[in-house]
């Protein structure tokens, strides 16, 4: 059987919450320490994956809330420094980080990765993540804010 679409790109996921050997794992069997995450990223790059999705969270969303969690931007920047080809799709939740700081972090990651970043705007997501940081806006308000965020980013870049 031949692949009819040679332009298909495959992506993977950086498990900033930790990881298990199979779906449905109750407790992280592999914590999200840098050595493990680097192994995941380098394996994906060796297998010619196109990109890696990195979520943005303020507490562990897969396992216990107090379980270890790797911070998105620091982790992505460190992993970009040890890879050559694979891209990083960073999930951004407008309102979690001030726009000016986001622009600086994205510019730094763009420079370190030599342009291998993409941005995934996530105005919805897990309500508890927003409430955890004192954000009680409804989803429609967050979608409006996402539109403003994107417009401001376009002006900055």
List the model feature ranges, each with a label:
Residues 8-30, 35, 95-157:
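Flexible, glycine-rich active-site loops centered on histidine and acidic residues
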Residues 52, 88, 117-119:
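Hydrophobic residues within beta-strands of alpha/beta enzymes
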